[in-house]
């Protein structure tokens, strides 16, 4: 398997532990919904002139596999595991507003109103294409011979990824996702890789990597503290409110046991609010919502992939992906080289 430019890797996505892992040793765990979302968004922005539905599906599929390719080249592996959302979510039984839609505050600003409308229309367009993600999950991935693709009713893809990491031992894991919930899974042998490709620059071509060292330097916390951070601070994307009036700064100070005092020596209001939330059980509830994996998540049994060039060619011809047929990387993967 060909490497991408190693100088570029060191500059933009260095992760010392993973750079020394033998070829095909690292497993790439794919957050299926996240990568599908990013692939769809990229396809819409990169090819705005495409209006035919089949052509849009083709660009989404290309962008999806392009992200797999970039990550595989970065970690010199063809070992993929896919995790997908279940149709229902058990967390809603604990907290009905989990992942609920938040109502934006009223505004008289024409600019803000216009931006909100543009975001709404963009979201509706992505949602209209989302059914194709199920085609990727239920048809394309298994038909290509990827054996390790999982979805469990009531659980999120995040939970499946957490179980995989939990049972991986010392096997190197690269999580392909932009969901910050995954940060709590980072360890000496687990890193997170961004699925976003924002431009055609060098930096855009190489996936950015967040390992344990980088996480601690940036967030001033250990990855093991991240779920507690989200329980206290809140998780807007999942509609978990957190403690009222407490932001990232005070949450970090509290979790690190640093002073949170006024000039007169009395505790600041944020600290009092956090302590009250621990006492009344609020944090216990929020922790159950944000900590991975969710209680009861099934174990994952991994198998061997069943790749063949015949399956790959059939998929490429069906979705008009002739350029993938000519790609040496995919020829290596599905040709068994």
Predicted regions and their residues:
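Noncatalytic, basic helical substrate-engagement surface that gates or grips nucleic-acid strands
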Residues: 2-174, 187-200, 205, 291, ...
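Long, highly charged, low-complexity intrinsically disordered interaction regions
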Residues: 153, 164-165, 175-242, 253
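Amphipathic alpha-helical/coiled-coil segments positioned at domain termini
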Residues: 309-311
């Amino acid at each position: 398997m060909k490497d991408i430019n190693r100088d570029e890797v060191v500059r933009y996505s260095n992760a010392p532990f993973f750079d020394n892992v033998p070829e095909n040793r690292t497993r790439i765990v794919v957050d299926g919904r996240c990568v599908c979302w990013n692939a769809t968004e990229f396809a819409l922005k990169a090819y705005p002139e495409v209006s035919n539905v089949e052509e849009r599906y083709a660009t989404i599929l290309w962008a999806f596999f392009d992200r797999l390719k970039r990550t595989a080249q970065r970690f010199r592996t063809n070992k993929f595991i896919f995790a997908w959302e279940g149709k229902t979510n058990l967390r809603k039984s604990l907290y009905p507003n989990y992942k609920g839609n938040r109502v934006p505050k009223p505004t008289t600003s024409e600019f803000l109103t216009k931006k909100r409308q543009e975001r709404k229309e963009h979201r509706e367009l992505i949602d209209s294409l989302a059914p194709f993600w199920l085609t990727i999950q239920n048809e394309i991935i298994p038909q290509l011979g990827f054996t390790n693709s999982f979805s469990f009713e009531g659980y999120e893809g995040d939970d499946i990824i957490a179980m995989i990491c939990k049972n991986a031992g010392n096997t190197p894991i690269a999580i392909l996702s932009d969901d910050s919930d995954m940060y709590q899974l980072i360890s000496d042998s687990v890193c997170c890789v961004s699925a976003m490709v924002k431009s055609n620059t060098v930096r855009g071509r190489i996936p950015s990597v967040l390992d344990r060292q980088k996480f601690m330097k940036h967030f001033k916390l250990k990855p093991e503290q991240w779920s507690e951070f989200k329980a206290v601070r809140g998780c807007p994307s999942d509609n978990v409110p957190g403690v009222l009036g407490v932001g990232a700064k005070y949450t970090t100070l509290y979790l690190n046991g640093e002073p949170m005092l006024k000039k007169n020596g009395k505790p600041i209001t944020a600290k009092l609010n956090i302590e009250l939330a621990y006492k009344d059980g609020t944090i216990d509830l929020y922790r159950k919502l944000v900590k991975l994996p969710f209680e009861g998540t099934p174990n994952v049994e991994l198998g061997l992939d069943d790749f063949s060039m015949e399956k790959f060619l059939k998929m490429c011809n069906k979705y008009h992906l002739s350029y993938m047929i000519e790609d040496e990387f995919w020829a290596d993967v599905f040709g068994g080289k």
